[in-house]
Amino acid sequence: MNKYTGISTLENMSQAEFYNKWTFDKFKDYVRGDILEVGCGIGNFTLTLSKYGKITAIDIDQSLVENLKKDKSYSINAGYGDIEKNDYFFQKKTFDTIICLNVLEHVQNDTKALGNMFKLLKKGGYLILLVPLYNFLFGEIDKSIGHFRRYNPKELVKRVQDLGYDIVSYRKLNLIGLIGWFITGKILKNKQITGYKIKLFNLVSPVLYLENLIEPPIGTSILIVAKRNK
């Protein structure tokens, strides 16, 4: 698994408060019980998740984990974890919900990582997976923040099913972000998402509510909710 190289991008994305809340609202009904956040980063979703259950947060970057543990607003159990290597600071623990948001694309052997998450999931538990879509969008930003790939939606859904998960739902998200990502990363060849671009995105983000009415045919990301039934 790639150690995250886009800390500034994570910090800038923390300012996309409307988008982060809108995204969380898409899966919050499945967040419960013992929660594992895979790749917590700087904690853009961690505090919100901690209000829905008992949270364990892992990241391959120990320094990010230590910063989270210093923040007294969190009530979490945080430590080192590499989902690809099946190596964690905890032992013999399973979870009701596993959250993996914009992490799988940083993992070289993503199939192995998905399989390891299945092992960590209790029977009846949910995996919530958010990943970037479409290799035609793969550009300088993806390279600079350590992405190995972007995903084909049908292929990823099938791969998740083949590993034993039952698909509860999946949908493409953030059509307007796709346009910005293509211009920024492919045409302008920028290597990061700047704070200025996030401010522009915040201005147009209310348009995302239209996606609550109808799923866009394409999007920047796909959100998959899967369940372990066996």
Give, region by region, the residue ranges found by the protein language model.
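A short glycine-rich, Lys/Arg-flanked "PGG" loop and its adjoining helix->strand segment in the class I
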Residues: 111-126
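A C-terminal cap/extension of S-adenosyl-L-methionine-dependent methyltransferases
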Residues: 3, 14, 88, 174-230
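Conserved S-adenosyl-L-methionine
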Residues: 165-175
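Residues lining the SAM
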Residues: 101-104, 130
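Short, glycine-/aromatic-enriched active-site segment of Class I SAM-dependent methyltransferases
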Residues: 127-149, 155-159
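Feature marks short, surface-exposed loop/turn motifs that line or immediately flank catalytic pockets
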Residues: 64, 87, 135-137, 176
